[in-house]
Each structure stands twice: as structure tokens, then as C-alpha cells.
């Protein structure tokens, strides 16, 4: 069967609070810090000029949740030479760690004992924010040890100049030792935008790969529907 992944809101739509390319240079003057906002941390940057338009607690540590997967994407793309043809085995043991965690899933478990291409797993991770796809990629690149993958994530964060970021897992599940800042996330995302297919994948609303058919609907309460 074929699998269709559909999302009504992009996984990365939340990044509008930290990245903005719509501001022209003429209108790039910083806004006053008394602007009313709901988010705890904000960094709004003109991507054309690199000028900060507005910021609020941009260096305070926050839990990144699913935006963690931006770094997971970076490590995956930099360590898999052929995204379209590399086949990655799906192991039940890797997926079992997500049970009872309330994880968002991409139905990867339907492929246990089989393989999926790296590109299908990247779409499965980024479009419906599939923690299962993130774990499979991390296990593969970490050669059977997800901790090896997480080490690569932290090394990359330092390389990118992140000063208040530490990753504890590849999927973003809550951990007191798993944090970043709006400024660091801006650095990570800016770098990700230079990598192959990142912008293409994160702008995708529907993706079809060889798997079971289901429809994924996202709203504020994050519900999943399979059919």
C-alpha cells in the first residue's frame, strides 16, 4: 500500500517567531521591547540583512520539543551520502522506547522487519513530526546506539556557535538536560536551510511513500487519525 502523510500546519511554522524574511531592509529597525507577545522567548531576524528586528529573552534556556528535529535532520543529512537509495532497517527495539511517552508518530512501526529509505524517514520525521522516524535515523547513524547520535548533535551545536544548548535525545521528548535558546535555535535553523532538501521538506504538506495509508491532521491539540 501507499502511505500519505498530510499536515495542515507545518512542523516548523512556529519558527516564524525566530526567523523572518518578509521584512525589507527599509523596515528593519528594531521594535521596542514593550510589544505584547505570548511566547516566553522570541528572536525575529531579517534574513536578508541579518539584523535582529525584535527579541525577547532570546538567550534564556527553553525546552525545544519537536524543533529538536532540526538538528536531527542536520546530523542525518551530513552522515547519509545517498538519501534516496540508502535503506534503513526498522527495528522494534528502537521503537519500543517510545511506548507510553505520548510521542507523535509517523506509523513507522508498520515497517518493523523491513526497511525504509533515508529520504522517506526524513519526510516521516519532519512532516508529521514523527518521533519514531527520528529514533530510527538516530539508531542507524549511531550504529545501534542512539547516545552516539546525540553526541554528534551536541558536537554540531558547539560547531555552530550555540552557547546554551544541550541535547539529550533526537526527538525532543522532555528531559531536564535537553534545552536550547531562541538565539541558538536561530543558528541551528539558519544552517539547516543551507542543507539539501531541508526547505523543500519543511514546506511539504503531503508526502507519499511506500507504506500503509493514513491521514494525519494537526490542530492545536495535536490529534492523529488513521484510515
Residue ranges and their predicted role:
Residues 2-6:
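Bacterial Sec-dependent N-terminal signal peptides
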Residues 115, 213-214:
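Short, solvent-exposed loop/turn motifs
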Residues 197-211:
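Acidic/histidine-enriched alpha-helical segments
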Residues 215-222:
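Conserved small/polar residues in nucleotide/adenosyl-binding loops
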Residues 27-183, 187, 192-193:
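Active-site-adjacent loops and short helices of periplasmic peptidoglycan-processing enzymes
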Residues 7-26:
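Sec-dependent N-terminal signal peptides of Gram-positive bacterial secreted proteins and lipoproteins
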Amino acid at each position: 500500500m501507499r502511505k500519505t502523510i498530510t499536515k495542515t500546519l507545518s512542523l516548523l511554522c512556529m519558527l516564524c517567531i525566530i526567523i523572518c524574511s518578509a521584512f525589507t531592509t527599509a523596515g528593519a529597525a528594531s521594535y521596542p521591547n514593550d510589544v505584547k507577545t505570548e511566547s516566553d522567548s522570541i528572536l525575529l531576524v531579517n534574513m536578508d540583512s541579518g539584523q535582529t528586528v525584535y527579541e525577547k529573552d532570546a538567550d534564556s534556556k527553553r525546552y525545544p520539543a519537536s524543533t529538536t528535529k532540526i538538528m536531527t535532520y542536520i546530523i542525518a543529512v551530513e552522515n547519509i551520502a545517498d538519501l534516496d537509495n540508502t535503506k534503513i532497517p526498522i527495528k522494534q527495539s528502537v521503537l519500543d522506547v517510545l511506548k507510553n511517552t505520548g510521542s507523535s508518530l509517523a506509523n513507522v512501526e508498520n515497517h518493523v522487519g523491513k526497511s525504509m529509505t533515508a529520504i522517506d524517514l526524513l519526510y516521516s520525521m519532519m512532516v508529521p513530526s514523527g518521533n519514531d522516524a527520528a529514533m530510527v535515523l538516530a539508531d542507524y547513524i549511531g550504529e545501534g546506539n542512539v547516545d552516539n547520535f546525540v553526541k554528534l548533535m551536541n558536537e554540531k551545536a558547539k560547531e555552530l556557535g550555540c552557547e546554551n544548548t544541550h541535547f539529550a535525545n533526537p526527538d525532543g521528548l522532555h528531559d531536564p538536560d535537553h534545552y536550547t535558546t531562541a538565539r541558538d535555535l536561530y543558528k541551528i535553523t539558519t544552517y539547516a536551510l543551507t542543507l539539501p532538501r531541508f526547505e523543500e521538506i519543511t514546506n511539504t504538506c503531503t508526502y507519499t511513500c511506500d507504506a500503509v495509508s493514513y491521514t494525519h491532521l494537526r490542530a492545536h491539540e495535536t490529534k492523529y487519525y488513521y484510515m
